[in-house]
Amino acid sequence: IIRDFAPDVVIGFGGYVSGPVLQEAAKLHIPCCIHEQNAYPGITNKQLAKQVDRVMLTVEDAAKHLDCKNEPTVTGLPVRGELLNKSKKSAREELSVPDGKYLVLSFGGSLGAAPLNDSMFDILLRHADDGSVYHIHSVGTNGAEYLDKFVEKGFERVSDTVVRKATVEVRKYIDNMDVCMAAADLVVGRAGASS
């Protein structure tokens, strides 16, 4: 596949699938690079660092854990521009959050995080009952059963992926993270490479 596609460069981000692809590309003398998002690199990037032409890091400390063929470059973490350029005022208008109301955004990454979902369940029920704050929570793609639990507690099913009650919205996945992040007064999330 690599030979047929003939890429100009191959870039990996540490997933186990990137290992064999980058190893084969390196054998074919195709320029290869990896990007490590974490302070402590995973196994795949540790192995590839010795073979690739360029290693890019989010944080400088990661270099201590890598045996790089060439000097690594600290690039930081590439972030979509819309995450940085949205105004709080326009984001809150887009989400219909009134001025003076507090907005909490909570999520456990794209797949979700069961401990966070479990912890947030009672908090979200309380916020929905008292209407004191606006709250958007994502259960993640692996947390769809939580939507049914909220419906059992009186939430309205807006769609297959969204339930709502009063000032609380629970989503399977947040497609407009740029808007939600810009509008939020408080973000509760698990530690992840890009969150």
What is each of the regions a protein language model found here?
Residues 15-17, 39, 110-111, 115, ...:
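Residue-level detector of alpha-helix initiation sites
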Residues 1, 75-78, 141-146:
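Conserved nucleotide-sugar phosphate-binding/catalytic loop shared by glycosyltransferases and other
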Residues 10, 186-187, 194:
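Hydrophobic acceptor-binding patch used for acceptor engagement in glycosyltransferases
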Residues 1-11, 18-33, 46-51:
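Glycosyltransferases and closely related glycan-assembly transferases
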Residues 14, 58-60, 192:
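Helix N-cap/beta->alpha junction signal
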Residues 26-89:
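Active-site-proximal region of nucleotide-activated glycan assembly enzymes
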Residues 88-90, 97-189:
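Donor-nucleotide binding loops and adjacent catalytic segments primarily
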